[in-house]
Amino acid sequence: MARLTYLGHAAFQLEAGGRKILVDPWLSNPKSPVKPEEVEGVDLIVITHSHFDHLGDVGKIAAKNPGAKVLAVYEVADLAAEEIAKETGASKDELFNAGRVIGANIGGPVVLQDLGLKVAFTPATHSSVGVAAGAVIITGEGRVYHAGDTGVTMDMRLVGEIYKPHVALLPIGGHFTMDPVEAAKAVELIRPLVAIPMHYGTFPVLYGDPEEFKKRVEEKCLPTQVRILKPGESYEFDFSKA
């Protein structure tokens, strides 16, 4: 059984196959139930893009968890390595050469054999130093798509067709990302079994309402269940036989 825990804003913790994965670890966000220095046992940190609310506290968390790997699109990985170097004293070259920081790109999955995981970066429509992306995390219990920050795009249909994510984590806040209307369209394109809204309510400008998102998805009569998680709440799943 895998467990997905919402840590506020766009941050999630995924526990699957005995591994602990963090995505977009801005744990100093005002909604987070845990502080960066409290997180232990992390195996992998996935970062979708370089904005402060996604690159987040990667330096502090990686320093606290010396066994954790950090995975991102290459230029974003380079920025993450800078943050880790500040906290640990290791050079960027040392971090890359030791495999602690891994640069990748949009395309086929990155195979992490020692963790029993695959991660595929997918297109996202957003600004970033380096390329903004989404990420599909492929585990034995199921496939989780974290869309990162993005507007709705027809590439999402390809994400659904190729990776068939069981769970989709979608921004709904508007202004910088999709709003509930666009996010509901994204669900229609991706067709996951479960959709979980994120990236709303952290700041006044992120006006998207998760209940409106749920209503608009239900109006489309899709085979998708919307689960609204409060920060600190978890969703457990096992789609290994789905």
Swiss-Prot record:
Q: Where are the membrane-spanning stretches?
A: none
Note the superkingdom of the native organism: Archaea
Among its keywords, does the record have ATP-binding? Answer: no
Q: Does the keyword Glycoprotein apply?
A: no
Q: Name one Pfam family in it.
A: Lactamase_B_2
> What protein is this chain from?
UPF0173 metal-dependent hydrolase APE_1117
Q: Which PANTHER family match?
A: UPF0173 METAL-DEPENDENT HYDROLASE MJ1163 (PTHR43546:SF3), UPF0173 METAL-DEPENDENT HYDROLASE MJ1163-RELATED (PTHR43546)
Cited InterPro entries: Metallo-B-lactamas, RibonucZ/Hydroxyglut_hydro, UPF0173, UPF0173_UPF0282_UlaG_hydrolase
In which organism is this protein found?
A: Aeropyrum pernix (strain ATCC 700893 / DSM 11879 / JCM 9820 / NBRC 100138 / K1)
List the GO molecular function terms: hydrolase activity
